[in-house]
Amino acid sequence: MASKKKSSFVNMVVVLLLVAAIAATALASVYQVTKGPIEKAKLEKDKNAVGNVVPEFNNDPVSESDTLAFNERDQLIFYPAKMDGTLVGMAVKTYSDLGFTERIKIMVGFTIDGKIVNTTVLEHKETPGLGDKMDIKKSTWCEQFIDLNIREIEDTDGDD
């Protein structure tokens, strides 16, 4: 029968380092394997969202998108919707920091004359049963914005 090794500080440190190295290697491997499919799924999600919020188009708005970055975290992404080369609308991937948990990512579609075609929530982490009612499957809140002309909205907060 093998004798039991006595625990020592060196033994514990070596075992801990070995476990940490194995866990880090496994985590890095999983990240490398899933990085591509996750990015592809995000692009597909954006493509579907653009299709839901703008008039009919026949170009690839995701590949023609343009980003307006305010800093590393804050940016707007514009997706031009074109029919036979003519701009028919614009989808804007934007956000709101007014959620209770994290940033809410939203896609808003406009016609070229400034009317909102539709909106959709792309990502949120709101509390189920409360804040998640912004999900189109649970509420029709976004219908209030359809056909709203942004050029006719009055500035009520006093800012220019």
Task: Indicate where each model-derived feature is located.
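Flexible, solvent-exposed loop/hinge segments and secondary-structure transition points
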Residues: A2-D160
